[in-house]
């Protein structure tokens, strides 16, 4: 939701790209 994929790869896989 604004964090890098390293912090939450499950919530941020393509939305953080």
Curated annotation (Swiss-Prot):
Q: What subcellular locations does the record give?
A: Plastid, Chloroplast thylakoid lumen
Q: What is its EC number?
A: 5.2.1.8
Q: Which UniProt keywords apply?
A: Chloroplast, Isomerase, Plastid, Rotamase, Thylakoid
| Keyword Isomerase in annotation | yes
Catalysed transformations (reactions)? [protein]-peptidylproline (omega=180) = [protein]-peptidylproline (omega=0)
Q: Gene Ontology cellular component? A: chloroplast thylakoid lumen
Q: Which domain of life is it from?
A: Eukaryota
Q: Which GO terms describe its molecular function?
A: peptidyl-prolyl cis-trans isomerase activity
- State the family named in the UniProt similarity comment for this chain: Belongs to the FKBP-type PPIase family.
Q: What does this protein do?
A: PPIases accelerate the folding of proteins. It catalyzes the cis-trans isomerization of proline imidic peptide bonds in oligopeptides.
Annotated protein name in UniProt: Probable FKBP-type peptidyl-prolyl cis-trans isomerase 2, chloroplastic
Q: Which organism is it from?
A: Spinacia oleracea (Spinach)
What high-level taxonomic lineage is stated for the organism?
A: Eukaryota, Viridiplantae, Streptophyta, Embryophyta, Tracheophyta
């Amino acid at each position: 939701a604004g964090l890098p994929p390293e912090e939450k790869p499950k919530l941020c896989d393509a939305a953080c790209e």
